[in-house]
Regions:
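Gram-negative/organellar outer-membrane beta-barrel architecture
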Residues: 36, 86-96, 100-244, 249, ...
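Hydrophobic core residues within well-ordered beta-strands of beta-rich domains
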Residues: 94, 110, 207, 248, ...
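Solvent-exposed, glycine/polar-rich loop segments of beta-barrel outer-membrane systems
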Residues: 229-236, 291, 324-338, 385-397
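Bacterial Sec-dependent N-terminal signal peptides
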Residues: 1-39, 298
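Transmembrane beta-strand segments of outer-membrane beta-barrel domains in Gram-negative
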Residues: 36-77, 81-82, 163-165, 171-302, ...
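C-terminal outer-membrane beta-barrel translocator/porin domains of Gram-negative envelope proteins
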Residues: 258-364, 369
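Short loop/turn motifs that connect adjacent beta-strands in outer-membrane beta-barrel proteins
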Residues: 80-92, 120-128, 154-159, 205-206, ...
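C-terminal hydrophobic structural anchor segments
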Residues: 360-394
Length: 433
């Protein structure tokens, strides 16, 4: 009987070990679906062999991440990761995995992510190029099929970026301006194709400029569940069952970050994009917009690696009348991260200013756990003169779990709050900004 007991104990312990390992992997898959990469520098790859060349080996051996824990659970020595880095082919890497995900706008979702990373040159001086395909199906009957890429030519002379998406995306819209309430919600159903492509030339150290083409096509737009004789803000603005915006853009970028997944103190990011939509290119109307995205990262003390991060995201209509679906809106930045504390599309208007700040601090000395506290303020208006009326605050705190110590990639779990009881969980792989 004692032998049977010991055998059952070993089997139970073994089963528990693999159960914990599976949970850790699912945690990774859960978060990985949140990664979005369309600008230069933000890698979609988190494999140690691709991103470890500039890190101090002795320091990394003292650090711990979820991959180390997983290897220990299956009785593997985490040190094999360092040996792998020495021997593996750094020029081509492919990874793919199914993964559940979650956001306020989609609810529970499921996707299959496939990523391909490669170097176009053998000299190891050229940045890594990447391609990501990640179709998503959600519990709210949404379908998103994004194809995103960032290709660097030899010696980083040019960077070719793309953000191509197909969306079948029922969601709520709340009207225009910053004073709308949850009671104003109207469900929209629509299909969308987005084709954004940019070609940037390196003009100096960390400085790029170039041109792009941006195309947004919405069709099958329908307002659902609207009571008879009710006039929505969409109706007042000018409801159409379809819209096309097609234009050229000028893009200027300064990016001193060496790691855009988890930017280091002292780094700066500034991006300005001017978009001119033209009827001659198939747009429904001539209109233009200006996007100003600026970020700065500060270390407040030489005795600490804690970081104060500040993000200013300004999305302005310069001229003309954009289609309702192309107006600036909460959570419709490239990474769907503005306005934590509010659901995507919660506010919408011709002009949007969003200011965010976040304090990032360590909890465990081995780097496994960290935390953040954050606050943001949005403002929306139909005219530039009323941009500060009203100011819409958001705030919250979050946990950082080190998934990959080589790339400094964190699993980011934030809980945000806003006005009138707005709140929710916000999940990312890599820092929010």
């Amino acid at each position: 009987m004692q032998a049977a007991y010991r055998n059952n104990y070993r089997n139970t312990r073994k089963g528990l070990k693999y159960f914990i390992a599976i949970i850790l992997l699912l945690n990774y898959f859960f978060i990985s679906a949140q990664t979005d990469s369309v600008r230069p520098g933000k890698s979609i790859i988190t494999d140690s062999g691709l991103l470890s060349r500039q890190h101090d080996t002795a320091f990394l051996r003292r650090q711990e991440d979820l991959i180390d824990i997983f290897l220990k659970i299956i009785r593997k020595d985490p040190a094999i990761r360092f040996e792998k880095n020495k021997s593996e082919n750094l020029h081509i890497h492919f990874s793919g995995a199914p993964s559940p995900s979650y956001s306020l706008a989609t609810g529970i979702a499921f996707n299959v992510t496939g990523s391909f990373a490669f170097y176009v040159s053998e000299d190891m001086k050229t940045n890594i190029s990447s391609v990501l395909l990640s179709p998503i199906i959600t519990a709210k009957q949404q379908l998103v099929v994004p194809l995103q890429f960032s290709i660097w030519t030899k010696d980083n002379k040019f960077n070719i970026q793309g953000d191509w998406r197909f969306l079948k995306y029922p969601e709520d819209t709340y009207g225009l301006g910053g004073t709308t309430t949850d009671a104003d919600a109207v469900q929209l159903d629509y299909d969308q194709i987005r084709l954004y492509t940019f070609v940037l030339k390196t003009l100096g150290k960390n400085f790029y400029a170039g041109l792009g083409y941006q195309y947004d096509n919405h069709w099958n737009i329908a307002q659902l569940g609207v009571p008879p004789n009710t006039v929505t803000d969409f109706d007042k603005y000018g409801f159409n069952s379809s819209s096309i915006s097609s234009g050229i853009s000028a893009d200027v970028l300064l990016d001193t970050r060496t790691n855009s997944i988890n930017p280091e103190a002292g780094s700066t990011y500034a991006n300005i994009v001017f978009r001119q939509n033209l009827q001659a290119l198939g747009s429904d109307a001539n209109w233009s917009s200006l996007l100003i995205d600026a970020r700065k990262y500060f270390r407040l003390s030489d005795r600490s690696d804690n970081i104060l991060a500040i993000w200013s995201y300004n999305w302005l209509t310069v001229s003309g009348k954009p289609p309702y679906m192309d107006l600036p809106s909460t959570g419709w930045d490239a990474y769907s991260n503005t306005g934590r504390g509010y659901v995507q599309s919660r506010f919408r208007a011709k002009n949007m200013i969003d200011l965010e700040t976040e304090y990032r601090f360590g909890i465990m000395r081995n780097g496994l756990l960290g935390g953040v506290v954050f606050a943001n303020a949005q403002t929306y208006s139909e005219t530039a003169g009323n941009l500060l009326k009203p100011i819409i605050p958001g705030w919250g705190a979050g946990l950082r779990i080190k998934f990959n110590k080589f790339s400094k990639t964190n699993i980011c779990l934030d809980y945000g709050f806003g006005l009138h009881g707005s709140n929710g969980l916000f999940v990312n792989l890599g820092e929010v900004f």
